[in-house]
């Protein structure tokens, strides 16, 4: 029974994911900290959430013109790897 990257066998490869960020980094940044107010930060995001979101963008279940175009050519492995990379980034949150 496979899960959304919650099963270790389904988990992506963060190193491979970093190599696949050519398109992603344009909006979300290589470090996952977006400088684009229209694109969310992905650094430190929950891996299973990223897998679910990218899978839904790819299928068209989730709508965003840019993301639907970008995600349509991603394989399951690409999605798992990119999600693993962004989830692996440590984000320090400072108190206000």
Where are each of the predicted segments found?
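C-terminal capping alpha-helices of c-type cytochrome domains
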Residues: 1-4, 48, 72-96
């Amino acid at each position: 029974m496979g899960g959304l990257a919650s099963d270790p066998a389904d988990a992506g490869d963060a190193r491979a994911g970093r190599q696949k960020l050519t398109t992603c980094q344009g909006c979300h940044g290589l470090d996952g900290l977006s400088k684009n107010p229209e694109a969310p930060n992905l650094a430190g995001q929950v891996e299973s959430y990223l897998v679910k979101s990218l899978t839904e963008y790819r299928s068209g279940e989730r709508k965003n013109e840019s993301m639907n175009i970008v995600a349509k050519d991603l394989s399951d492995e690409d999605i798992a790897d990119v999600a693993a990379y962004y989830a692996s980034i440590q984000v320090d949150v400072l108190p206000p």
